Amino acid sequence: MSIYDIAVENYDGSTYLLKRYKGKVLIIVNTATNCTLNDQFNKLEMLYKKYHKYGLEILSFPCNDFNNQEPGLIKDIYRVYKYKFGITFPIHAKINVNGEHEHPLYTLLKCKQPGLFGSQIKWNFTKFVVDQQGNIVKRFLPCDNPNQMEKLIRQLLK
């Protein structure tokens, strides 16, 4: 299965296939507003503003899998992302990234780029970089600053 065959749901309930991003470099990240790592929203947004015009897309997937750090309804989460954090990149419906109900996207991401200690997502803000052909090229840890991805993003966009 290709990443482009996977359907995802937008914050508004509409669904689409990831094939709409063929030819783009993607950063896919599970996010949470109440996480202590939420300062990464600003850094991700800066990358998005800098490289979006060259073909970068950042896909945010709110996730409540870790310590109830993303409770609430997606309509409320969307407002916080937009108005508190100033996010302009795509925000999706809440998903599970581990376990029995994990989203197929995360099943694929973890299969192609397992972590250091197994395939489970350990925390919010685990970041995956996907190239223009749909290859999942690198997994970044939650504690990795999004700016650490910039060199790879530049290389892929050339």
Swiss-Prot record:
Keyword Oxidoreductase: yes
UniProt-listed Enzyme Commission number(s): 1.-.-.-
Residues passing through the membrane, by range: none
Pfam family, one: GSHPx
UniProt key word Oxidoreductase: yes
GO BP terms: cellular response to oxidative stress
Keyword annotations of the record: Oxidoreductase, Peroxidase
Enzyme class: oxidoreductase
InterPro entries noted in UniProt: Glutathione_peroxidase (IPR000889), Thioredoxin-like_sf (IPR036249)
Organism superkingdom: Bacteria
Molecular function in Gene Ontology: peroxidase activity
Active site, UniProt feature: T36
Record-given protein name: Glutathione peroxidase homolog BsaA
Lineage: Bacteria, Bacillati, Bacillota, Bacilli, Bacillales
